[in-house]
């Protein structure tokens, strides 16, 4: 089985910043990877296109995926509002790791984060399901618009997204 690759075209206050592509580990976490893939294509009628990264903490991570409330309190999965933690096989080993944000055990929706550092304290709590393939420089550029409390100085959006 070939793992899917998806892309985000990132914009800052509406101006193009660049493309980030992700390898999704469907061989290890098929349900979680499929959720992210389908939300990236928008094939279920909803998804990431036009949504923002509402929380960016330099030296930690960039969080997005709340396409319903745009502030970190919303989002939904392709399986319903929430779905269970699939497994914790993959670890938060360093920059570029793609992992599910949650509000405790078995509360995965659509929110995710891209690590910009090793975050081993999240192992066993958040499901890792992908990795930046290309465009880590774009993720690093996004980081510059973040702050210690996560508030962004400019609006960082997913202007377009899909599967490669």
Curated annotation (Swiss-Prot):
Record GO terms (molecular function): cyclosporin A binding; heparan sulfate binding; integrin binding; peptidyl-prolyl cis-trans isomerase activity
Post-translational modification remark: Acetylation at Lys-125 markedly inhibits catalysis of cis to trans isomerization. PPIA acetylation also antagonizes the immunosuppressive effects of cyclosporine by inhibiting the sequential steps of cyclosporine binding and calcineurin inhibition. Acetylation at Lys-125 favors the interaction with TARDBP.
Residues bearing the modification N6-acetyllysine: 28, 44, 76, 82, 125, 133
Activity regulation info: Binds cyclosporin A (CsA). CsA mediates some of its effects via an inhibitory action on PPIase.
N-acetylmethionine PTM sites in chain numbering: 1
GO biological process, one term: leukocyte chemotaxis
Phosphothreonine sites (modified residues): 93
InterPro entries per UniProt: Cyclophilin-like_dom_sf, Cyclophilin-type_PPIase, Cyclophilin-type_PPIase_CS, Cyclophilin-type_PPIase_dom
Domain of life of the native organism: Eukaryota
UniProt KW keywords: Acetylation, Apoptosis, Cytoplasm, Glycoprotein, Isomerase, Isopeptide bond, Nucleus, Phosphoprotein, Rotamase, Secreted, Ubl conjugation
Catalytic activity of the protein: [protein]-peptidylproline (omega=180) = [protein]-peptidylproline (omega=0)
Modified residues (Phosphoserine): 77
Domain PPIase cyclophilin-type: 7-163
Enzyme Commission code: 5.2.1.8
Modified residues (N-acetylvaline): 2
GO cellular component: cytoplasm; cytosol; extracellular region; nucleus
Cross-link annotation Glycyl lysine isopeptide (Lys-Gly) (interchain with G-Cter in ubiquitin), location: 28
Subunit structure: Interacts with protein phosphatase PPP3CA/calcineurin A. Interacts with isoform 2 of BSG/CD147. Interacts with FOXO1; the interaction promotes FOXO1 dephosphorylation, nuclear accumulation and transcriptional activity. Interacts with integrin ITGA2B:ITGB3; the interaction is ROS and peptidyl-prolyl cis-trans isomerase (PPIase) activity-dependent and is increased in the presence of thrombin. Interacts with MAP3K5.
Stated family: Belongs to the cyclophilin-type PPIase family. PPIase A subfamily.
Function field: Catalyzes the cis-trans isomerization of proline imidic peptide bonds in oligopeptides. Exerts a strong chemotactic effect on leukocytes partly through activation of one of its membrane receptors BSG/CD147, initiating a signaling cascade that culminates in MAPK/ERK activation. Activates endothelial cells (ECs) in a proinflammatory manner by stimulating activation of NF-kappa-B and ERK, JNK and p38 MAP-kinases and by inducing expression of adhesion molecules including SELE and VCAM1.
Protein name according to UniProt: Peptidyl-prolyl cis-trans isomerase A
Organism: Felis catus (Cat)
């Amino acid at each position: 089985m070939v793992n899917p690759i998806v892309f985000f075209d990132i914009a800052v206050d509406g101006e193009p910043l660049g493309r980030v592509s992700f390898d999704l580990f469907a061989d290890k976490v098929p349900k979680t990877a499929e959720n992210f893939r389908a939300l990236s294509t928008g094939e279920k009628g909803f998804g990431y296109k036009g949504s923002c990264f509402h929380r960016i903490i330099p030296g930690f991570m960039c969080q997005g995926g709340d396409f319903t409330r745009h502030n970190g309190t919303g989002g939904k999965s392709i399986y319903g509002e929430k779905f269970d933690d699939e497994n914790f096989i993959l670890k938060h080993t360093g920059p570029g790791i793609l992992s599910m944000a949650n509000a405790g055990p078995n509360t995965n929706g659509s929110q995710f984060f891209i690590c910009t550092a090793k975050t081993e304290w999240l192992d066993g709590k958040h499901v890792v399901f992908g990795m930046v393939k290309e465009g880590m420089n774009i993720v690093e550029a996004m980081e510059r618009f973040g702050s210690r409390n996560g508030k962004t100085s400019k609006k960082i959006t997913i202007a377009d997204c899909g599967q490669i």
